[in-house]
């Protein structure tokens, strides 16, 4: 599609659109028309669409760095989901006159918002960023020394120390010498020879006295429970610790597979009270495993009981049985009774039950 021609000269390609005049103008005609008077120089103008070059630009796509009209913006950014995520801003109109000497590129940056494209010709800002990054990489001044010894942090420099007296130098060497790069955590036994050598090399013996002592791991853990399954008839015994209880469980019951009764568990001693007694009677005996003869006797008794069982037919609901016998039947099935039949049935069967006050049971 051919580009849109200028509405003024009708020969050159239109480069911008004047909104107050509603006219497409080329660069030369724009400079002539809008430089005529002060009122014309205030006209807001926008660039042409960079895709179709037929309509004025409406938005600026920051991802594509292109000014687009409404139609091209809809067609391009609805093609796929990735294009829909492009950030777009409205076109900012400009009021300066545009010269036709090849400065269109520079003016295009002005019509696009400078806050979004500040790094196009920003050599100064790039230099500032490089200087800021280099400031983080600068090494500290060798004349300035920061030391930390025995909890004291001090900064000494050549400019801050007035004079070079031997007394001051001696004090600095005595107070602010180089610290040991490793911390002494005082774990385990330390060789006295190595320790004295480190203290002499550091030169900080007179600043803060360090008490070297051996940290011993406690051998007895509090709140511990000892389970003794080695056997024997010993009960629960007090282990001697503050909160440590030693449990000794008899394993004779575990060997035969029978749960012991309450008498097999002995007393437990507690530090804050008297001995805890079991709920069972201490005079009761433990369960003894059955012998083969006793087991055979039990099996025989069970078999005798099973043989002597009686399966007799008993009438559980006598009243229901009597009522079922009174109801009329047709071919063995119950039939509906009419009023006359009901009266006849009552009269006919009245003599049978006349001598009984209750429903008979069979």
Swiss-Prot record:
Cell compartment(s), UniProt: Nucleus
Alphabetically ordered keywords of this record: Metal-binding, Nucleus, Repeat, Zinc, Zinc-finger
Signal peptide: none
Residue span(s) of domain CCT: 295-337
PANTHER family membership: ZINC FINGER PROTEIN CONSTANS-LIKE 4
Annotated protein name in UniProt: Zinc finger protein CONSTANS-LIKE 4
Annotated positions binding Zn(2+) 2: 49, 52, 72, 77
């Amino acid at each position: 599609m051919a580009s849109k021609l200028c509405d003024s000269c009708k020969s050159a390609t239109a480069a911008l659109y004047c909104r107050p005049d509603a006219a497409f103008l080329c660069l030369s005609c724009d400079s002539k028309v809008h430089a005529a008077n002060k009122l014309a120089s205030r006209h807001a103008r926008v660039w042409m669409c960079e895709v179709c070059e037929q309509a004025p630009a409406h938005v600026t796509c920051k991802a594509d760095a292109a000014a687009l009209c409404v139609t091209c913006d809809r067609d391009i950014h609805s093609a796929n989901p990735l294009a829909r995520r492009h950030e777009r801003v409205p076109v900012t109109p400009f009021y300066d006159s545009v010269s036709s000497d090849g400065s269109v590129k520079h003016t295009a940056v002005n019509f696009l918002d400078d806050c979004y494209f500040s790094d196009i010709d920003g050599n100064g800002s790039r230099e500032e960023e490089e200087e800021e990054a280099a400031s983080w990489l600068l090494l500290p001044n060798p004349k300035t020394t920061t030391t930390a010894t025995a909890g004291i942090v001090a900064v000494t420099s050549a400019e801050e120390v007035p004079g070079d007296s031997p007394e001051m130098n001696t004090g600095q060497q005595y107070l602010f010498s180089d610290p040991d790069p490793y911390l002494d955590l005082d774990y385990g036994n330390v060789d006295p020879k190595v320790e004295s050598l480190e203290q002499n090399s550091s030169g900080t013996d007179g600043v803060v006295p360090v008490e070297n002592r051996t940290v011993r791991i406690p051998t007895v853990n509090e709140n511990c429970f000892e389970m003794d399954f080695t056997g024997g008839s010993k009960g629960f015994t007090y282990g001697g610790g503050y909160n440590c209880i030693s449990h000794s469980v008899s394993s004779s019951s575990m060997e035969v597979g029978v749960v012991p009764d309450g008498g097999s568990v002995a007393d437990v001693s507690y530090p804050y009270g008297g001995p805890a007694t079991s709920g069972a009677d201490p005079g009761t005996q433990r369960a003894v495993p059955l012998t083969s003869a006793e087991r055979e006797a039990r099996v025989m008794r069970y078999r005798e009981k099973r043989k002597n069982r009686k399966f007799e037919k008993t009438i559980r609901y006598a009243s229901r049985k009597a009522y079922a016998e009174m109801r009329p039947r047709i071919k063995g099935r119950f039939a509906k009774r009419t009023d006359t039949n009901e009266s006849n049935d009552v009269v006919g069967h009245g003599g049978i039950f006349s001598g009984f006050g209750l429903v008979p049971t069979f």
